[in-house]
């Protein structure tokens, strides 16, 4: 099993993110897009983050692979998220979450041989992956699952 905390990824501002800073917290990874029917989930993600920020980090990863619904630059994405939803949780650089250029983070999240839990494929924007404070994949949730769903929040209590 590969350690998720060793995976390298940059923020939307092109600064290195050290995932090990979030050891001992749950991390909810979400592939996000600004022009999707599920984009309104940004609001619930922000509310969830504010409610549980002592034991939860949310990390959004912009992705343009589903319906070209995240065409903007890093600056566009950051402005959209702040102005429309007041997003304060962590956002990564735009990445691929599937296919031949799949980012190492999403390789780990979707491959049982790496995460030692489950294999999956990212089906659409706003699919969610919950990682435990010990760095284990807890579960994944399709786009239709709201951030406030008890399927997710039961782990945070």
Model-derived features: positions:
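N-terminal "domain-start" segment that seeds a small globular fold
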Residues: 1-20, 40, 104
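Amphipathic alpha-helical repeat scaffolds
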Residues: 11, 31-35
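Thiol-based oxidoreductase modules, predominantly thioredoxin-like and allied folds used
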Residues: 31, 55-73, 88-99
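Short, internal strand/loop/helix patches
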Residues: 75-123
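Conserved helix-turn-beta segment immediately C-terminal to the redox Cys motif
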Residues: 24-26, 35, 39-64, 81-85
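Thiol-/selenol-based redox modules, centered on thioredoxin-like
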Residues: 107, 112-157
């Amino acid at each position: 099993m590969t350690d998720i905390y060793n995976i390298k990824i940059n923020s939307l501002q092109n600064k290195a993110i050290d995932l090990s800073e979030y050891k001992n917290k749950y991390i909810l990874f979400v592939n996000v897009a600004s022009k999707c029917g599920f984009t309104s989930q940004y609001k619930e993600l922000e509310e969830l983050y504010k409610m549980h920020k002592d034991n939860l980090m949310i990390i959004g990863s912009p992705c343009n692979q589903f319906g070209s619904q995240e065409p903007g630059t890093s600056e566009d994405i950051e402005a959209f998220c702040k102005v429309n939803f007041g997003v304060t949780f962590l956002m990564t650089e735009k990445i691929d979450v599937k296919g031949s250029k799949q980012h190492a983070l999403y390789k780990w999240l979707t491959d049982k041989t790496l995460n030692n839990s489950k294999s999956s494929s990212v089906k659409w924007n706003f699919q969610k992956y919950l990682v435990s404070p010990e760095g284990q994949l807890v579960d994944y949730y399709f786009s239709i699952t709201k951030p406030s769903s008890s399927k997710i929040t039961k782990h945070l209590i």
